[in-house]
Amino acid sequence: EVYVSDKQLAAQENAVNVEMGIVPNGYAWIFPKKDHLSCGIGTALTKINKFKDLLYYYLDNHPNTKNYKKLILKGHPLPHSYSVELVINTERAVLVGDAASVVDPLSGEGIYYAMKTAEIAVKHILKKISKNLSLDNYSDEINKTIRSDLYYSDKFARLFYKFPKLTYDLGVANPIVNKKFQDLLRGKTTYKEMYEILKPIYSNKFTQATLKLADKIKQKFIK
């Protein structure tokens, strides 16, 4: 939580910033709120040196957060697993949301999955009460629907965070890919469907772009 001047708050009022290249294997963001800005950084790396310094650098150099009045730091790991054999229940309890390790590996988003797993949990709890059906069915449904799709999100995440500029140029900046991600956010498609559509289109382009980049590096550094 970052408290800034009224002028800075107004400047960010209708804008959302998601910026690559500042954090290794991750991104930085700024979201407007009623009386402050929600700012932060995230990374797919399990360990990174001087992580807080990257946040301070970002805030000190962005016009809408520079010389901020007050900063409240919060942070926690985002657990995710795409193992379709993960058990997230007993016969008396179920895990939902972050506790069930259903965070999107690509975006770090977890609110949707928290709500979705809670909805599915209620269904299976009611079946447990009314028909004495096993809550193992809850784990099975989460693994077959949500977690199996996060497997493909992880594929996108590994590619994007390893080659951010390349994947941005070939994918994000492309209107077709952009539209697919919009459909994903609206719940009109899944990561698996996106992967199956985009892989044959971009795998060859990505290989060619990678080879060109490798050739440039070779020419510059290897004599």
Language model features by range: what are they?
Residues 123-223:
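C-terminal helical "tail/cap" subdomain of flavin- and related membrane-associated enzymes
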Residues 10, 66, 149-150:
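Catalytic phosphate-donor-binding core of small-molecule kinases
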Residues 22, 31-36, 63-66, 72-77, ...:
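Mobile, glycine/GP-rich and aromatic-enriched active-site lid/loop segments adjacent to catalytic centers
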Residues 6, 18-22, 33, 39, ...:
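Generic structural "secondary-structure junction" signal
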Residues 47-125, 130, 136-137:
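FAD/FMN-dependent oxidoreductases across multiple families
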Residues 1-52, 56:
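Conserved FAD-binding catalytic core of PHBH/FMO-like flavoproteins
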Residues 7-16, 73-80, 95-96, 139-140, ...:
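Short, mixed-charge, low-aromatic patches
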Residues 28, 42, 83, 108-111, ...:
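Short capping/connector residues at structural and topological boundaries
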